[in-house]
UniProtKB/Swiss-Prot annotation:
Heme b b566 binds at H98, H197. SUPFAM superfamilies: a domain/subunit of cytochrome bc1 complex (Ubiquinol-cytochrome c reductase), Transmembrane di-heme cytochromes. This is Cytochrome b. Component of the ubiquinol-cytochrome c reductase complex (complex III or cytochrome b-c1 complex) that is part of the mitochondrial respiratory chain. The b-c1 complex mediates electron transfer from ubiquinol to cytochrome c. Contributes to the generation of a proton gradient across the mitochondrial membrane that is then used for ATP synthesis. InterPro entries: Cyt_b/b6_C, Cyt_b/b6_C_sf, Cyt_b/b6_N, Cytb/b6-like_sf, Cytochrome_b, Cytochrome_b_C_euk/bac, Cytochrome_b_N_euk/bac, Di-haem_cyt_TM. Keywords: Electron transport, Heme, Iron, Membrane, Metal-binding, Mitochondrion, Mitochondrion inner membrane, Respiratory chain, Transmembrane, Transmembrane helix, Transport, Ubiquinone. One of its GO terms (cellular component) is mitochondrial inner membrane. Heme 1 (or BL or b562) is low-potential and absorbs at about 562 nm, and heme 2 (or BH or b566) is high-potential and absorbs at about 566 nm. The gene is MT-CYB.
Length: 380
């Protein structure tokens, strides 16, 4: 009998082991769909981004008009641009839900998979930031100025670093050119890191809602989870298309309809919604260096998750105290997101500071203590 090509061909064998014959726990829920949804987001962003790059000009005098030209004169240019801009929002929704799932179900105990995932998040954040600068609107320009300026808080080398990043003494043409180059490059780095992420995941196999070994009860990925993933794709693409068609500017900033002007500062400089939680943490500390450190810590704290796990149980499925803490953290992140969009005025300043303090307290102190307390309760 001829050998099965799917199982023996050097390339098809890899696809087979990852997407067809992959042994998968039979009880993984819809929360496990977000990995594949992120893959679809990445592919959509690369495709729409490539089409946009064909019509874009990375020059301060032409960038804004080239984006307007794409929307007005290119066949379906408006749709490609709207899909790309709103696709970024959906990408972040998916990645935040994916991280939340990993946190809830203790997936961070697969350390390599978790760490590559956090690196992926950081790379995605960098990509989104440099991409937001490209249309060269007011918020693009001032967002770039404010965020890159944060590097000047680094002692001794800060100012040199900022001028090196700008390619001059302010955000100008060299900055835009290099940001375009980076925005083109980074998604492909993300794609490469994704393969590493999956390689590490397939070393251990997927976790499951019970957090126990599922080796005795696994089913092939195809047709069960391939079908489930396709349903996920449809459910993901529906809101994306709806947003892109009916409310394309709903998540954007109206300030970005004005071309960049270094002489006029917008009344409220704020990033896109998906960075607001970190922006609120940055603003909650009155010291520049302290704010930058807190901003970095807000994401880098994820690297500590495996070391802060004190519970004898992997997931939070049967840990009501940790569940309460988890949902408090989620609510806290919503509060931070809201605070980040507000002006720096009385009620918002103290609220942001309390929310920032709560964020780090829950992650670094309360989670480990609760884990140990639940271990004690198990013995009663």
């Amino acid at each position: 009998m001829a050998p099965n090509l799917r199982k023996h061909h050097p390339l098809l064998k890899m696809v087979n082991n990852s997407l067809i014959d992959l042994p998968t726990p039979s009880n993984i829920s819809a929360w496990w769909n977000f990995g594949s949804l992120l893959g679809i987001c990445l592919m959509t962003q690369i495709l729409t981004g490539l089409l946009l790059a064909m019509h874009y000009t990375a020059d301060t005098s032409l960038a804004f008009t080239s984006v307007a030209h794409t929307c007005r004169n290119v066949q379906f240019g408006w749709l490609i641009r709207n899909l790309h801009a709103n696709g970024a929002s959906l990408f972040f929704i998916c990645i935040y839900l994916h991280i939340g799932r990993g946190f809830y179900y203790g997936s961070y105990l697969y350390k390599e998979t978790w760490n590559t995932g956090v690196i992926l998040l950081l790379t995605l954040m960098a990509t989104a930031f440099v991409g937001y600068v490209l249309p060269w609107g007011q918020m693009s320009f001032w967002g770039a100025t404010v965020i890159t300026n944060l590097f000047s808080a680094i002692p001794y080398i800060g100012q040199t670093l900022v001028e090196w990043a700008w390619g001059g003494f302010s955000v100008d043409n060299p900055t835009l050119t290099r940001f375009f180059a980076l925005h083109f490059l980074l998604p492909f780095i993300i794609a490469g890191l994704t393969l590493i992420h999956l390689t590490f995941l397939h070393e251990t196999g997927s976790n499951n809602p019970l957090g126990i070994s599922s080796n005795c009860d696994k089913i092939p990925f195809h047709p069960y989870f391939s079908t489930k993933d396709i349903l996920g794709f449809i459910i993901l693409l529906l809101p994306l298309m709806t947003l892109a068609m009916f409310a394309p500017n709903f998540l954007g900033d109206p300030e970005n309809f004005t071309p960049a002007n270094p002489l006029v500062t917008p009344p409220h400089i704020k990033p896109e919604w998906y960075f607001l939680f970190a922006y609120a943490i940055l603003r909650s500390i009155p010291n520049k260096l302290g704010g930058v450190l807190a901003l970095a810590a807000s994401v880098l704290v994820l690297f500590l998750a495996p070391f802060l796990h004190m519970s004898k149980q992997r997931t939070m499925t049967f840990r009501p105290l940790s569940q309460l803490l988890f949902w408090t953290l989620v609510a806290n992140l919503f509060i931070l997101t809201w605070i980040g969009s507000q002006p720096v005025e009385h009620p918002f300043i103290i609220t942001g500071q309390l929310a920032s303090l709560t964020y780090f307290t829950i992650l670094l102190i309360l989670f480990p203590i609760t884990g140990m307390l639940e271990n004690k309760l198990l013995k009663l």
